[in-house]
Amino acid sequence: MALNEQFLEEEIHPIDIVEHIAEHHEWEFDRIEENQIAMAVEAQWRTYSLTLAWSGFDETLRLICTFEMEPPKERLPALYEALNEVNDRCWTGGFSYWNEPGLMVYRYGLVLSGGQFASPEQIDTMIGAAAVSYTHLRAHET
């Protein structure tokens, strides 16, 4: 059954959809609060930590995907240059490196202004795009 077939009858909170997707894929998750969920997603190279949060004020579903990374300090300039190159090629989302906690970060916001609702396919694609984007980043590692 397609993901959206289960939600045709009624509009549903975006985080409820994310929770359903996590259950469907058998990902570990924690519903932190009504508007936020955290998940661990196993991929080929590592486990990614994903957090999705809904802001009704901004009408945006925000995804933050991270993994731990502690490059040597002398490699940070090369890392930042690679992030700039990859961000130039990313049509959606963008990468940052948070030095203090040692996290590589991919961020994406799905704007749903005007009372729009996210479909399960949009959210599933949004989550998948994070993993695909990390593939592009790996291609730039030196």
Model-identified regions with their sequence ranges:
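Terminal, regulation- and interaction-focused segments at domain boundaries
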Residues: 1-14
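Conserved small/polar residues in nucleotide/adenosyl-binding loops
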Residues: 135-142
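Ser/Thr-rich, low-complexity intrinsically disordered terminal regions
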Residues: 20, 24-63, 68
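Short, aliphatic-rich beta-strand segments
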Residues: 104-108
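Short, internal acidic amphipathic alpha-helical interface segments
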Residues: 66-103
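Hydrophobic packing residues in well-ordered alpha-helices of helical domains and bundles
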Residues: 123-127
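Well-ordered alpha/beta subsegment
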Residues: 111-120
